[in-house]
Amino acid sequence: MSYIIDRRLNSKKKSMVNRQRFLRRYQQHIKKAVSDAVDRRSITDIESGESISIPTRDISEPIFHHGSGGKNNRVLPGNDRFNGGDHIERPEQGQGGGGNGSGASDSGEGEDDFVFQISQEEFLNFLFEDLALPNLVKRQLAGNEEFEFRRAGISNEGSPGKINIIRSLRSANSRRIALTGKKRRRLKEVEAELEILEPESAEAQALLAEAEELHAKIKRIPWLDDFDLKYNLHVKHPLPTSKAVMFCLMDVSGSMDQATKDIAKRFFLLLYLFLQRNYERTEVVFIRHHTSAKEVDEQEFFYSRETGGTIVSSALKMMDDILQTRYPASEWNIYGAQASDGDNWNDDSVICYRLLTEKLLPKVQYYSYIEITTRERQALWHAYEQVLSDFPNTFAMRQLQSAADIYPVFRQLFQKQTT
């Protein structure tokens, strides 16, 4: 009978296994609560834990119990009103018996919700479940630091932990056979002659002495020698890595009011958390633009108050310049995400179309554009519609009207593709 011992380290919480089973069972309720939390949270509080409320009726278990009809003989404790043989009127259907609830209600019934807390780790797991960067491919990089060990046969040297017992014993057995073969053949001849001769004869005594000497020589051969030890050989092979770079392009022009900028920042913060959590080797390039574009760090990207006019092509040109100098397409998976309110200088939308179709999209794996506006779509949106028709597999565009649209649109843009 086989026994499997799970030696994986568990957390300090003794009920972790039951908790994980509970989270899997009610993941639909939790996913909805996580989605609602993203809509109402501030930018700085988007990655903390969350209190999840599940209606009691959804976690109730089916049970067997007596129905309200039929005739039953029961012993009721605490009876001070009836004697044996008294007839008790049957209550009407639906009456009698107290219920549980959360206070007064005009509906006549109610139950408290079951509320529990999920950690930051669990919150982010549900937040980014089934999401992935589209079209991510393996690329062999110069100076690659990732390796894996592969079997490469047998070696005569190695660490004790890699010793190959079967090969070592086989080698020892072969050595003993090779070194004692001549002696064993002579020993067989001597034993055959001894069976013919008289035991007391002088010739037999000489053969016995020779046989004893042969046995002693055979025993002197070591059973296992250092030369017999064989080790499993493992060699390092470089691995192709999925290094990726994400360009975040945000419009901070004067037409973007504070509410629109907050929606854009929340979208990019969600994207940034997703990349940092799921892809360790992903670099992020932040570009803010109005009439001119500027590469900034994370702090300035999310919290700078600089503003101005609107020339979207300045950000696309800067992205192309950075690609040429730092991120060659042959070695990097390149992604782009752009957020704007759609307002642009009149003739600049045509320039944006040319930059995307001629320079950027042939190099990138995926490029997404979100337009944050409740107004009618303008020239930039229509120009990007032409881009979408030319590159349907690597370009995507969505419209956001409020903060409630951020998470659903984010999941649409980065939904894991099934092949």
UniProtKB/Swiss-Prot annotation:
It comes from the Bacteria. Residues 63-111 are annotated as: Disordered. Pfam families: DUF444. Residues 83-92 have a biased composition (Basic and acidic residues). Coiled coil: none annotated. NCBIfam families: PRK05325.1-2, PRK05325.1-3. Belongs to the UPF0229 family. This is UPF0229 protein TERTU_3150. It comes from Teredinibacter turnerae (strain ATCC 39867 / T7901).
